[in-house]
Amino acid sequence: MASIDRKHLAEITAAVLSFLVSLTTILGIPVALYGYLVTQQQSRVDRAFQFYKDFRDGNLDADVKLLVEKANAKAKEMQALVDKDDQVGILGLQTSLVRDAQVDTALAHVIVFFDAVGPCVAHALCDADATIALLQYQAKQLVKGYGAYVYDQQQSGAPFGNGIFIVNGLEASSRISSLFPWPGRTAN
């Protein structure tokens, strides 16, 4: 009779342990997945912040200031052309700005930088929301002042200048979609 009680107790213990293992597995998988997603999100934010640090630590900040200063000097002329929807005139004015060697060099530096940032965001390797907060203002200023020129310099199939337009066009996402970036984001 004692061997039957031991056998019954062993079966009950095995069933309880099996239940606990199953429960732990069922609860552990979502927790592990959430941890993985949070880590990936933090990695994307860190990459975006590293671009921002590179922007601030290098001469890129000074380059953007120079470019904006030169474009702002022609802001009234630019606005008159925009009001008339004179695309050829806008391109001509922006091209005349880039004829200055300092402006040309600064624009080249900035375009190369944004050509690294844009695809990083477009392919969800960098966080879009962090990029918006840290770098979109500068991209918008540059597209406003030099967008027609950069667009005119692009060649079919070549990625030159795409990054600045990618960063310029970013829209803030909801918090849940930033944890799951793959369904909604596409490369331009």
Which positions does each model-derived feature cover?
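Membrane-proximal alpha-helical anchors
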Residues: A2-I90
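An amphipathic alpha-helical interaction surface
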Residues: S96-N188
